[in-house]
């Protein structure tokens, strides 16, 4: 059985973009693959985090993973900082990565642009991400387009390590879903929907109530033409809404174009709002159940225990290959 690894930062907000692009497919993948789903809290502290808020967000994210349908009997759900091997492996990989490779990362350029000072952690984020993936002999990493460059660097580091120290790592592949992988902002459909957008109208969260969802979709940017057809270049706003509708309803974009032929944006948006509300309602109910349940800690304890067994063994092999410590 092939292995999948995926990590999400505990930022406190999960958008429907995250749900469609990642979480939703995780639920299907867990039955076909050996899956590790990681709450990457060490990645989160590359920028300042309020400690109390971070700890709350870790718990909330775990509850959201379970609420969308991750089954702890089928997949391993754990917190990155509870598995020390991640930081240990990241240091070893930092020692074989080049500064130039890290500085070329698009995300580093974007996040450091215009800032007087940036943390070293922001620059060395990719080796930690590579460690996350390589520790579990990962075959497949489901990611959005924006993470492709990091996976390419992970592959380079795995190949470099294998060449220098002997075959140890599986070379992972990125899996980018074709439909709905890149859900765009509701206020600027040329940009990806992001939880860090300063305008809350730009995204819908997993926990938004019905009224908020209706308002956000009603105010979503479209165009003045008024016809419901998919054209990413000329009609990015309505194309983005069609993408959301198609992915959540299971109807093809062609079916939706026929269904709404001759109908206005108002009718389409009202129907889409109901599709989103009905999709999120059971998730929200399960989320509140998990947040109030002591079972959540048991799931995370078991996940950390399982991940530690696998990851610590890989770190031992890495250290042995690099000549660290004593041979036992």
UniProtKB/Swiss-Prot annotation:
EC number: 6.1.1.2
Keyword ATP-binding: yes
Residue positions binding ATP: 9-11, 17-18, 144-146, 183, 192-196
Keyword Transcription applies: no
Location, primary (coarse class): cytoplasm
Location(s), subcellular: Cytoplasm
Segments carrying motif 'KMSKS' region: 192-196
GO function terms (MF aspect): ATP binding; tryptophan-tRNA ligase activity
Pfam families: tRNA-synt_1b
Catalytic activity: tRNA(Trp) + L-tryptophan + ATP = L-tryptophyl-tRNA(Trp) + AMP + diphosphate + H(+)
Motif stretch ('HIGH' region): 10-18
Residue pairs linked by disulfide bridges in the UniProt entry: none
Gene Ontology cellular-component terms listed: cytosol
Family matches, as PROSITE patterns: AA_TRNA_LIGASE_I
Residues annotated for L-tryptophan binding in this entry: 132
Activity regulation note: Inhibited by indolmycin, a competitive inhibitor for tryptophan.
Annotated keywords: Aminoacyl-tRNA synthetase, ATP-binding, Cytoplasm, Ligase, Nucleotide-binding, Protein biosynthesis
GO process terms (BP): tryptophanyl-tRNA aminoacylation
Physiological role: Catalyzes the attachment of tryptophan to tRNA(Trp).
Family: Belongs to the class-I aminoacyl-tRNA synthetase family.
Quaternary structure note: Homodimer.
Protein name per Swiss-Prot or TrEMBL: Tryptophan--tRNA ligase
Organism: Geobacillus stearothermophilus
Lineage: Bacteria, Bacillati, Bacillota, Bacilli, Bacillales
Gene of this entry: trpS
């Amino acid at each position: 059985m092939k292995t999948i690894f995926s990590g999400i930062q505990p930022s406190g907000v999960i958008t429907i973009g995250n749900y469609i692009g990642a979480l939703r497919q995780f639920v299907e993948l867990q039955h076909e693959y050996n899956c590790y789903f990681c709450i990457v809290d060490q990645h989160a502290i590359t920028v300042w985090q309020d400690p109390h808020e971070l700890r709350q967000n870790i718990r909330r994210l775990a509850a959201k993973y379970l609420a969308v349908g991750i089954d702890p009997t089928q997949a391993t759900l754990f917190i990155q900082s509870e598995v020390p091997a991640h930081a240990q492996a990241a240091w070893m990989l930092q020692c074989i990565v080049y500064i130039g490779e890290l500085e070329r990362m698009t995300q580093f350029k974007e996040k450091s642009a215009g800032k007087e000072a940036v943390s070293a952690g922001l620059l060395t984020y990719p080796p930690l991400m590579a460690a996350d993936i390589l520790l579990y002999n990962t075959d497949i990493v489901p990611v959005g387009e924006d993470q492709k460059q990091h996976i390419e660097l992970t592959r380079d580091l795995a190949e470099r390590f294998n060449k220098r120290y002997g075959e140890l790592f599986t070379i992972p592949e990125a899996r980018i879903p074709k439909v709905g992988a890149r859900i765009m902002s509701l206020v600027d459909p040329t940009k990806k929907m992001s939880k860090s957008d300063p305008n809350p109208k730009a995204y819908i969260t997993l926990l938004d109530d019905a009224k908020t969802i209706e308002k956000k979709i009603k105010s979503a940017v479209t165009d003045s033409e008024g016809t419901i057809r998919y054209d990413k270049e000329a009609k990015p706003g309505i194309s983005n809404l069609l993408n959301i509708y198609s992915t959540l309803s299971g109807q093809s974009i062609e079916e939706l174009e026929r269904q709404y032929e001759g109908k206005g944006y108002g009718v389409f948006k009202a129907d889409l709002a109901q599709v989103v509300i009905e999709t999120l309602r059971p998730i929200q109910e399960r989320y509140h159940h998990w947040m109030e349940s002591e079972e959540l800690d048991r799931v995370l304890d078991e996940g950390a225990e399982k991940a530690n067994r696998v990851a610590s063994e890989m770190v031992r092999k890495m250290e042995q290959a690099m000549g660290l410590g004593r041979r036992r």
